[in-house]
Amino acid sequence: KLDGMRCICILSTKNPPVLKSRDGRIIEGLTHITDELSLIKADIILDGELYAHGLSFQNNMKLIKKYREGETENIKYNVYDSMSESEFMDRYLKACSIIKDCKHVQSVKTYAFHSEEEMKRYHSDNISLGYEGSIIRYGDIGYENDKRSKYLLKYKSFQDIAAIIIDILPSEADPKKGVPVLKYNNITFEAGTAFSHADRED
């Protein structure tokens, strides 16, 4: 599971490639990606994620939403599906075949597993490589557009603790908001969400 921006790419033999967000907004400023995609002569719609591995979600968004010379070029288009009525593996392999020569467009590795033990092993590998989690797909139906598919499941690992809230530190930027101070096993610490106030408003 990649913690970036969902991106739909419309490729056409007649028109330049178009990158769109999940809600249909045109994504601009990623010419290092669209220049490569323009060399592909195919009529296909790709589905994937704009993402630079190793960066936080917030830093990925900064580089995607506003061009920063020498930094935005680290963003890659990670393709994991294409839109058609074909079964998933056919869609995936077709997408992989047309982007195989690209530098900034790459396929997301996909594995088949046949037991819970195998699934957990692949998931553990994903976590150790610094990914957010895993996406589990089952079934062979065609691409489902404009809906959350019941055949796709997010799989994450969590560690839960029960800590006592002993204080809330007000924010200098917005006094109505703050950071909770927690206590667990005689250890006091602050807990945040890693989101800015602007991100939380969004």
Residue ranges of predicted features:
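Classical nucleotidyltransferase
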Residues: 5-10, 14-48, 147-202
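Extracellular/periplasmic catalytic domains that process cell-envelope and extracellular macromolecules
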Residues: 71-72, 127-128, 174
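Covalent nucleotidyltransferase
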Residues: 1-106
